[in-house]
Curated annotation (Swiss-Prot):
Residues 407-482 are annotated as: Type E motif. The gene is PCMP-E70. The keyword Nuclease does not apply. Belongs to the PPR family. PCMP-E subfamily. GO terms for biological process: RNA modification. PANTHER family: PENTATRICOPEPTIDE REPEAT-CONTAINING PROTEIN. Keywords: Repeat. One of its GO terms (molecular function) is RNA binding. It holds the Pfam family PPR. The keyword Metal-binding does not apply. It comes from the Eukaryota. PPR repeats lie at residues 66-100, 101-135, 136-166, 167-197, 198-232, 233-267, 269-299, 300-334, 336-366, 372-406. This is Pentatricopeptide repeat-containing protein At1g09190.
């Protein structure tokens, strides 16, 4: 018994991750490989350390695993994945004639919630009803999570209504479920019914309102949360800062900044620092964004990307390019596809075509990143803005991806600025082909012909618009122009 207690203490010690093989060896040396209790603990620790391979190897040598061991394996795969393995162990347990208990079903339901196919979950729910475990509160919470994660809010509501006691966890699941399925009003109604709310409840509701374009209501809810004495956490900060920037409510954003500094959130979470950099970039204060960036003790690729892109948006492309160079020179963080989109935008705003071409090649050759449609679009925009419209056109025609409306729009705008009517006509006609239902493109083409006095062509465009039952409407094209 003493050796078992010692091994249990070792399993729950501070250095367990590095000592798993040593602890396992102790277990074998003292002939405890038949102790299902110890083995279940060992497998549970493997799961908490995301080491499912080791757990599986240990399980494969157990001659007579009991429900404790199977529960540990089911929980291990519910934590680490793949979730289908949990169901496999559940099936194996049943085939051996081992009865499941209440500790079997909670992780099993969690695994079912992770699967996109609800059929498995419904089978488990049926099993729960047959065995009577569905009456247990924590099991019902798992069933609610199963249905909310699968968007089956009717089924979730039925289980929720049957619960005599509902804790904050199940309320949060229902609110998030309704909001994620598009019924924000229902989610808000439930939120207002809650007698006790957690910070998770507030964050879920604020985020859901913002996602459906109701930023003003989201901010009002945040203010109500503060008035009720809740302190913002990481998720609150990351959610509310973009809302503050979108609404132009700088005082709120600065208050959140101050709170994040004093509470330690800024120090503890890279995401908070990134959100602050983004907030100040979107608010037009690149100096404050840079100060936050430099103050961050740890930075990831998002940190660099946010400030590089923010430099372009704020008309400081040169600074953004220098920042990119510093990132590469430092070498701690590798750039990704978004990094190059940001720095190419910086090149575009500063007219540095050659540097942009160099970076475009660097992305694929040195960093082995695949150029996406957005990167080709950035190159077209770079050449077009710099007046190198013939190069831009050749690039468009020879690139391996299909040109989209934004690319042809960039070229068209540049052609009109530089008086290249012939190429402008080609670009406008391509826009009409890509977006035949966008009346703004027809108006652009018609105006081009009108400026050249080609009235027969103007009439052809108008006839085509009538044929396609299109009317002139403002704001449909990304290119500004006078109407026909």
């Amino acid at each position: 018994m003493e050796i078992e207690r010692k091994l249990l203490r070792l399993l729950h010690g501070h250095n367990t991750r590095t000592r798993l093989p040593e602890i396992h060896a102790h277990l074998l040396r003292h002939f405890l490989h038949g102790s299902n209790l110890l083995l279940a603990h060992f497998i549970s620790i493997c799961g908490s350390l995301s080491n499912s391979d080791y757990a599986n190897r240990v399980f494969s040598h157990i001659q007579n695993p009991n429900v404790l061991v199977f529960n540990a394996m089911i929980k291990c795969y519910s934590l680490v994945g793949p979730p289908l393995e949990s169901l496999s162990f559940f099936s194996s347990m049943k085939s051996r004639g081992i009865w499941a208990d209440e500790y079997t079903y909670a992780p099993l339901l969690k695994s079912c919630s992770s699967l996109s196919d609800l059929r498995f979950g419904k089978c488990v729910h049926g099993e729960l009803i047959r065995t009577g475990f569905h009456r247990l509160g924590k099991i019902r919470i798992g069933v609610v999570e199963l249905y909310t994660s699968g968007g089956r809010m009717g089924d979730a509501q039925k289980v929720f209504d049957e619960m005599s006691e509902r804790n904050v966890v199940v309320w949060n699941l229902m609110i998030r479920g309704f909001c994620d399925s598009g019924d924000v009003e229902r989610g808000l109604h439930l939120f207002k019914q809650m007698s006790e709310r957690s910070i998770v409840s507030w964050n879920s509701m604020i985020s859901s309102l913002s996602k459906c374009g109701r930023d003003r209501e989201a901010l009002e809810l945040f203010c109500e949360m503060i008035d009720q004495g809740f302190d913002p956490d990481e998720a609150t900060v990351v959610t509310v800062l973009p809302i503050s920037a979108s609404l132009g409510v700088l005082d709120t954003g600065k208050w959140i900044h101050s709170t994040a500094e004093s509470s330690g959130l800024f120090k503890d979470f890279i995401t908070v620092g990134n959100a602050l950099v983004d907030f100040y970039c979107k608010s037009g204060d690149l100096e404050a964004a840079t100060a936050i960036f430099r103050k961050m003790q740890r930075r990831n690729v998002v940190s660099w990307n946010t400030l590089i892109s923010g430099s372009a948006v704020n008309g400081k492309g040169e600074f953004g390019i220098d920042l990119f160079d510093a990132m590469i020179e430092e070498g701690k963080v590798a750039p990704n596809e978004a990094t190059f989109l940001g720095v190419l935008a910086c090149c575009s705003y500063t007219g540095q075509v050659e540097r942009g071409e160099e970076l475009f090649g660097l992305m694929m050759e040195r960093f082995k990143l695949e150029a996406r449609t957005e990167h080709y679009g950035a190159m077209v925009d770079l050449m077009s803005r710099s007046g190198r419209i013939t190069e831009a056109f050749k690039f468009l025609k020879n690139m391996p991806v299909n040109a989209n409306a934004a690319m042809w729009g960039s070229l068209l705008s540049a052609c009109r600025s530089h008086g290249d009517v012939k190429l402008a006509e080609v670009a406008a006609m391509e826009l009409v082909k890509i977006e035949p239902g966008n009346s703004g493109n027809y108006v652009l083409l018609s105006n081009l012909y009108a400026e050249e006095g080609r009235w027969q062509d103007v009439e052809k465009v108008r006839t085509l618009m009538k044929k396609n039952r299109l009317r002139k409407s403002t704001g449909q094209s990304t290119i500004c122009d006078v109407s026909v």
